[in-house]
Amino acid sequence: MKVRTLLCVCALLFSLTVAAQFQPERYPKREFRAAWIQAVNGQFRGIPTEKLKQNLISQLNSLQEAGINAIIFQVRPEADALYASQLEPWSRFLTGVQGQAPNPYWDPMEFMIEECHKRGMEFHAWINPYRVKTSLK
């Protein structure tokens, strides 16, 4: 009886060992290595559209080289928007005047989505839902 039990246990262990070799490979969870690009630090205001686009592209290239795989981009700094919106005015941090559309016209959020995806980066829109005004000039 003991020999029979021992043989059954050995057969079971052998079966489990063989079955374990055929399990699908488990991949580690992908790391979220993000950088935050904010609008309220003044990097947008007063800069011509093409220069601003080049600055953003340069930032994205540097961040990609550093291993960043996601961008968190501030799209609503103060109850306004850095994207075309039916509800919110254009941000003063983009044009210098709240409610004034960029000239020449462009949509910073759309631009950033396209540029992030060209680099295989995730894009995350960050909003300030409650901030109405800051003391920044």
Task: Describe the role of every protein-language-model region.
Residues 30-32, 36-38, 42-54, 114, ...:
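Active-site-adjacent "subsite" loops/lids of carbohydrate-active enzymes
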Residues 54-81:
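Catalytic domains of carbohydrate-active enzymes, especially glycoside hydrolases
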Residues 40-50, 90-106:
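The substrate-binding groove and active-site-proximal loops of carbohydrate-active enzymes
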Residues 81-96, 131-137:
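Aromatic- and acidic-residue-enriched segments that line the glycan-binding/catalytic groove
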Residues 108-132:
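Substrate-binding cleft of carbohydrate-active enzyme catalytic domains
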Residues 1-7:
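Bacterial N-terminal signal peptides that target proteins for export
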Residues 15-17:
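N-terminal signal peptide c-region/cleavage motif recognized by signal peptidases
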